[in-house]
């Protein structure tokens, strides 16, 4: 009887490992919104970390969050480091590439509660009625990340935050309340 239980458990574990191994190794979350403002103003808002508090969907989750900025605003190599409560954790963003006023790339590192590194890209396209801001986050999933993806859909987990952030960016830009 014990032998059958052990064999059944081994089969179950092997099936779970096989299922996790077949999960996608990458993820991508993307949202966009047209904002009635110039690409330059919007580029400055997303590439200058000092301005993120005006529109970031996470800025108000921890009023006591400690933030540190390094480097010149909107310059490659500038960083934004935060340490906060359980809702925001600890992490760092580094501006890695810019193509003013149409694109900003950011290395996003989560340090706590778990470590991961992803890329965020803001693409800006001139359209009738304003500028389309496209916010993309993509990354690699290791075995544990693939296992977590069985229970958590990255698009459903992060997508609504991107939608809130873009809506706040739109309100701040169109309402003239973005910091200079």
Q: Which positions does each model-derived feature cover?
A:
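Generic structural detector for well-ordered beta-strands
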Residues: 32-36, 81-83, 94, 105-107, ...
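Beta-strand/loop substructures that line and gate deep hydrophobic ligand-binding cavities in soluble
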Residues: 96, 107-163, 169-171
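Short, surface-exposed coil-to-beta transition loops
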Residues: 28-30, 88-93, 115-121
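A generic structural signal for beta-strand entry/edge sites
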Residues: 26, 101-103, 128-132
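Short beta-edge strand/loop motif at the mouth of beta-sheet-based domains
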Residues: 50-92, 98-101
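Short, highly charged C-terminal tails/helix-capping segments
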Residues: 67, 170-180
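Hydrophobic ligand-binding cavity/cleft-lining segments
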Residues: 4-72
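Extracytoplasmic/secreted envelope proteins and their assembly/folding machinery
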Residues: 39, 43-52, 77, 92, ...
